[in-house]
Amino acid sequence: MREIRLARLDKTRPVVVLTRDPARAAMTKVTVAPITSTAKGLCSEVPVGVENGLDHPSVVSLDNVVTIPVDLLGRTIGFLTAEQESLLARAVVLAYDLDLPLMNAS
């Protein structure tokens, strides 16, 4: 399951860590997608909430992905569900306008 951790960005906020676990041990930076309570209704957002360790309903914003030093990551607060992992993959394809077939596209 993909981790949701606190990170120091513009302020301390939850993020989904996108860098795969095996690579993290060798990296000084990781790529993360910030989580915000300001949903814009975009296809590049993934809904998350209390079931993921958050205080309130929010979205993972794949339009605002950043790479940060590992030492800006804080504690783990939760994880994405299997369904949210699928939505995350779909949101990445849509956010970056990748030419890949989408499963269950609607």
Can you annotate each of these PLM segments?
Residues 52-106:
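C-terminal terminal-subdomain/extension
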Residues 6-50:
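Compact nucleic-acid interaction/catalytic patches
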Residues 1-4, 62:
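Loop/turn positions that initiate beta-strands
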Residues 3-4, 14, 94, 106:
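Small, basic N-terminal interaction modules of short regulatory proteins
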